Amino acid sequence: MRLTMRWFGPSDKVKLEYIKQIPGMKGIVSAIYDVAVGGVWPKEKILALKNNIERHGLTLDVIESVPVHEDIKLGKPTRDRYIENYKQTLRHLAECGIDTVCYNFMPVFDWTRSQLDFKLEDGSEALIYEEDVISRTNPLSGELELPGWDTSYENESLKGVLQAYKKISEEDLWDHLTYFVQAIMPVADEVGIKMAIHPDDPPWSIFGLPRIVTNKANLERLLSLYDSPNHGITMCSGSLGANEANDLPEMIRHFGGQGRIHFAHARNIKRTGPRSFQESAHLSEAGSVNMVAMLKAYHDIGFTGPLRPDHGRMIWGEKGRPGYGLYDRALGATYLNGIWEAVSS
């Protein structure tokens, strides 16, 4: 595997020179953050990002993410225009030497948590998800503002989007995902980009919205939509691991054995009840995911792709983007490296 780290560009408090100092760190996972969703990413912006990263002795290994416009997910007549823009962005990325793109198909909201600064017993702060809190929350109230959410919506436009989704069933969303995949994958194949869909986080419906990339059966169905080795998965242990029915090592061996895992997020979570969890340190005993068994599965399939530590706790007084501080993710990266060295020896 190739160890990577998420970086949110020049405004990120976690500097590239700090990331470079993490033992074994090779690559960066990033994106262009100042182009509106649905717009074409200019080649010069991609090159500027890549060159900045390379000046620090790292490589731009994965784009996470190129967002999918809501009109595509809703199946609106305007989707074709946004799909053409998406294709052009893929062409620009390939021309800049990028070969892996992570994306998701979660309606309206990206990853969702009920609290960003829950204090754990050791004094660190973590992201948590409590189903009873979310079920009582009105997404229009402004009570929850999460880093994973698209804050470009004004309250009225968000209300309109949520209203539109009341007419969209899971099967409708599958139809729209199929349309999107079958439209973009010929271009991805043409330019040599591996597309890696990220599972829904958490892997169940929230606020009455359909979510369809949640388990092994869903991923099988996804891969059946288009026959290409470039059509694949971001295997996220934190997202899929929130549901204890998901056997992560088995899924890694199954999909990785097909060569369909193009990118991996390795993190731990502690399940605290039905549809509830806390994000924990990466250490196996800190949560519900057997990290050693998971990394061994990656080793056994000969995984050589990019893998990154995912959300970390806030520790040692660090302040910054929830889940994306330096210290705990650096500890996580070193822990993952240690497991990899052990299973490889």
Curated annotation (Swiss-Prot):
According to UniProt, this protein's pathway is: Carbohydrate metabolism; pentose and glucuronate interconversion
Q: Known catalysed reaction(s)?
A: D-mannonate = 2-dehydro-3-deoxy-D-gluconate + H2O
Q: Which gene encodes it?
A: uxuA2
Origin organism of this chain? Halalkalibacterium halodurans (strain ATCC BAA-125 / DSM 18197 / FERM 7344 / JCM 9153 / C-125)
Question: Which family does the UniProt entry place this protein in?
Answer: Belongs to the mannonate dehydratase family.
Q: What is the lineage of its organism?
A: Bacteria, Bacillati, Bacillota, Bacilli, Bacillales
Supply the name of the protein: Mannonate dehydratase 2
What this protein needs as a cofactor is:
Fe(2+); Mn(2+)
* Top EC class, one word: lyase
Enzyme Commission number, as recorded: 4.2.1.8
- Record keywords: Iron, Lyase, Manganese
